[in-house]
Design a protein with these regions (language model features):
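Donor nucleotide-activated moiety binding/catalytic core segment of transferases
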Residues: 110-125, 301, 337-371
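Hydrophobic beta-strand scaffold residues
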Residues: 30, 156, 160-163, 326, ...
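Short, solvent-exposed loop/turn segments at secondary-structure junctions
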Residues: 12-14, 37-40, 62-63, 137-140, ...
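Nucleotide-activated donor-dependent transferases that construct or modify glycoconjugates
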Residues: 2-12, 35-36, 105, 133, ...
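Conserved N-terminal ligand/cofactor-binding loop architecture of enzyme catalytic domains
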Residues: 21-120, 161-261, 265-266
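Conserved nucleotide-sugar donor-interacting segment of glycosyltransferase catalytic cores
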Residues: 118-182
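Histidine-anchored nucleotide/phosphate-binding helix
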Residues: 8-26, 305-320
Length: 371
């Protein structure tokens, strides 16, 4: 009997490419759950590159009416020991501060979660997969499905980015090597110093590539015009009616939001240039605390208790020895990727006598050397 393999596919093509090449070398039954927009959906409906025994489209089910059961979510949480509401309250789509296009009610969120939990259980009960193959989970539904597979004892094969150059690795967990202790114990000793490793990491740091990508796209007038033409003329905007992740994203509203964000980004960058330290003065001992880009998976899913970074800075500053300062550096991709933070947040940090805000252009290595 052949193995049964389940894939989570989305707009990022890596998982589909994995399925394509695996199918060439293994006679295995493939199944898939697909989370894409309407435009991309047509490809998965018509493609002949990979034969899937059955395909489910996540948002098709989210649009179906169900007869809700009041205790279903509670029983699901107890059955699998998964805190659904903890995941929901850290979903960027459901957080008003991040999603300015649509405000979800608790009832709507509850209904969405019930539909997806029923779908996920139905798929896993029907397929009974031997393996779940996926890329890194970035959004709540994908992460919930991954957690459910783990709880059901399904072998997870997750392709993780090593955040070290162009390397990746396969693991059963997000950003964790399954056999790290074994690999570490059996490794061959190499004449490598800490500085060697630090320099290698600095040369291959991922944030530099991400920042370059954002800048090349957001600073390109041609690409901005192409995006506006795509939005206003070519797009039918059907996702706004069929995908809850696009609720409220009417064409004009999205265009005005982008214009508004561009203006905000300019003013915020001007404030940063005028008010953040661009040289490290080490006349007093200090602790270095770099901020994380937000909204981002690394906070919302990996460290939800610390998603309010302003509160985290305030808390850490209160724990410092009396003669220490806290040097806080903005993330280099917060501007190009997220239009910087509100100026009021920066001012709140500046009002803390223990805090010094460091310009995002200052290399972290330089700060660490002087800390």
């Amino acid at each position: 009997m052949s193995n049964r393999v389940l894939f989570w596919l989305d707009a990022e093509p890596t998982a589909f490419c994995i399925a394509y090449y695996l199918k060439k070398i293994h006679d295995t039954d493939f199944f898939t759950l697909v989370d894409v927009t309407n435009r991309q959906k047509s490809f998965f409906q018509s493609q002949k590159l990979v034969e899937f025994k059955k395909t489910w489209f996540y948002h098709d089910v989210m649009n179906q009416e169900i007869k809700s059961e009041p205790d279903y979510l509670k029983s699901f949480e107890e059955k699998y020991d998964i805190d659904l509401w903890q995941l929901a309250k850290n979903d960027r789509i459901f957080i008003d501060y991040y999603n300015t296009f649509y405000k979800f009610s608790d009832h709507e969120i509850s209904e969405i979660m019930e539909k997806e939990c029923r779908l996920f259980e139905e798929i896993l009960d029907e397929v009974k997969p031997d393996f779940f193959i996926t890329t890194q989970t970035a959004f709540r539904p994908h992460h919930l499905f991954y957690l459910l597979c783990k709880k059901k004892g399904i072998k997870v094969l997750m392709l993780n980015s090593a955040n070290w150059g162009k390397h990746c690795y396969i693991s059963g967990n997000y950003h964790k090597l399954d056999n790290f202790n074994e690999l570490f114990a059996n490794r061959k000793a190499l004449p490598t110093t800490f500085n060697d490793i630090q320099n290698r990491l600095e040369s291959k740091i991922l944030s530099k590539k991400v920042s370059k990508f954002y800048q090349s796209h957001k600073n390109s007038k041609i690409k901005l015009m192409q995006a506006a033409f795509q939005l206003l003329i070519l797009s039918d905007n059907s996702n706004e009616k069929t995908h809850y992740t696009y609720y409220g994203r009417k064409k004009l509203k999205v265009l005005l939001s982008e214009i508004n964000n561009s203006i905000k980004r300019w003013y915020r960058k001007k404030y940063i240039d005028q008010n953040f330290l661009q040289e490290i003065i080490d006349d007093k001992p200090f602790i270095f605390l770099p901020l994380q880009q937000e909204p981002e998976r690394s906070l919302l899913l990996s460290a939800p208790d610390y998603k309010n970074q302003i509160e985290t800075v305030e808390y850490v500053s209160k724990c410092l020895p009396e003669n220490f300062l806290l040097f806080v550096k903005e993330h280099p991709t917060q501007g190009s990727g997220r239009d910087w933070r509100e100026i009021s947040q920066y001012k709140a940090l500046q009002n803390n006598p223990k805090v010094r805000l460091i310009h995002p252009s200052v290399p972290a290595a330089e700060i660490i050397k002087k800390s």
